[in-house]
């Protein structure tokens, strides 16, 4: 995207996501976007452009932008195939109007976008209060910042074992930024947000789940918070790792049973590794076999996690 945008330039920049689509479809999308951006008014457009220029400058919370969110829904209606849906909606309903931490597998930069759209389509209040924990890469370009604006985000440093972009920061600076981000996350939970955490810490290149990071238990300190596991499929093809364009695919979000964070922590004796492995097993339980990865049925050293999953997450 160009650094300075007028309404026409924004529409043209957005359609670069759609390279490879037929000309008629792109023209229809271009017309719909131009109409809706104009209808939103100059104030909404100016606010969006300012956000594109400034978001990500601090380890802080960035709210959703209404116009960006609407644009994403317009695109989703034309990109997500008809079979795209949410399964286990009764579990989403059980988490309504509660502080909740959603733990998901991580396949692409479009995961949070698809989850927001699918929650919106089933009328869940979680869509409107979704706030994703986001690493620095999410803010590294205008295109990625635009994609982040249809939900709230909290910028956080990546785990030191995975980080590349934060290499210029000292360990002390990373720790300070992480503490600040966690404090902000707790504030957003108290304000009623639904936190979305990709606890693998990075996107999976094999599509299979990677080991959950034990440090993600820091988001579970709120006494009455729920844990809601979800497994996403399809986004690995929608916006592949290394790709720059969106592809028309079927995406499915499969939700598991929500559990009180307090109960899991008590049952696990506050063992951070066991807590996160149990959540990993809960995510794997709703995913197809090829996506279970480190938490598949054949993996060893997960007996305690499987026992807790059976006790707490299974109906």
Language model features by range: what are they?
Residues 70, 151-166, 258:
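Short, basic/glycine-rich phosphate-binding loops at helix/coil junctions
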Residues 97-99, 127-129, 192, 224-227:
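A general structural motif
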Residues 133-135, 156-158, 222, 230:
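Generic beta-sheet signal
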Residues 117-124, 218-224:
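Short, surface-exposed basic-aromatic patches at helix termini and helix-loop junctions that form
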Residues 90, 106-108, 134-139, 201, ...:
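Short, flexible loop/turn elements at secondary-structure junctions
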Residues 2-29, 165-315:
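Non-catalytic C-terminal accessory region of glycerolipid acyltransferases
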